[in-house]
Regions:
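Short beta-strand-to-turn element immediately C-terminal to the catalytic PLP-Schiff-base lysine
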Residues: 6, 44, 76-79
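Short glycine/threonine/proline-enriched tight-turn/helix- or strand-capping micro-motif at secondary-structure
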Residues: 11-17
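Short structural boundary motif marking the start of a folded domain
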Residues: 1-4
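Short Gly/aromatic-enriched secondary-structure transition segments
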Residues: 42-50
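Helix-loop element at the rim of GNAT/NAT acetyltransferase active sites that forms part
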Residues: 38
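Residue-level recognition of beta-strand termini and adjacent short loop/turns
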Residues: 8-10, 23
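Histidine-centered active-site/metal-ligand motif
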Residues: 7, 42, 69
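Glycine-rich beta-strand-centered segment in the early N-terminal region that forms part
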Residues: 20-34, 49-101
């Protein structure tokens, strides 16, 4: 699949990446709308600000990273243990990392 990824200040690239699978406790969303917000612009012009350069302890993500965190779409796959949404549900995403414990 194609994705816009941040590699560094003023260095974003459209790249072919592997399409993700719905892992345990997660869902896969087919994006139907994605906005570019102020934080995306700040990352482009002056980052990294929030983009993890080292592996993030909760997400496992690190740069280069796919941009665009304000999006909506519909669920196309659910991972093991997911019970609150099902395939076909329309969703919006709250892009906040949390441990889920506290």
């Amino acid at each position: 699949m194609k994705a816009l990824r941040w590699h560094g200040v003023k260095d974003i690239r459209v790249e072919d990446i592997e399409e993700p699978k719905a892992e345990k406790g997660k869902v896969k969303v087919k994006v139907e709308w994605c906005g570019i917000c102020g934080s995306d612009l700040h990352e482009y012009t002056a980052g990294p600000i929030f983009i993890p350069i080292e592996t993030h302890p909760l997400s496992g993500d690190k740069a280069p990273i796919v941009l665009g965190h304000e999006f909506s779409g519909h669920v196309v796959e659910v991972g093991e243990g997911v019970t609150k949404v099902q395939v076909g549900d329309r969703v919006v995403v709250e892009p906040i990392y949390a441990c889920g414990e506290c």
